[in-house]
């Protein structure tokens, strides 16, 4: 079975049933179920989630991309700092980057003020964090491959 094709279909729409996926990839439903179970066990498939357009609800949220310059640790490099950052509930993603900063962190909070306080009191105080630059999301046009229409 073409692993890439099955994974791309699931990435685009995780609600497809194994029966639907089997038709789309030209395989038996049982083969597809086994492949999905194997991908989940091996950590290829890391999870399933709903992509919410919070602007269409009564409880809007604020989001930000935060650039961090950090000093890597001698034995663990960037992994230790990234690991500490990942554990905050406000953090949605952490990326090691090339270019003018080291880590890119996406954060969600109830308000911009909540995010600002998170950066000031929790993120910037981590040992090894040299500087932060916070960029608030003003409008989300596309996320996770899905177009958001206002």
Indicate where each model-derived feature is located:
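A compositional/biophysical signature of low hydrophobicity enriched in polar/charged and small residues
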Residues: 1-150
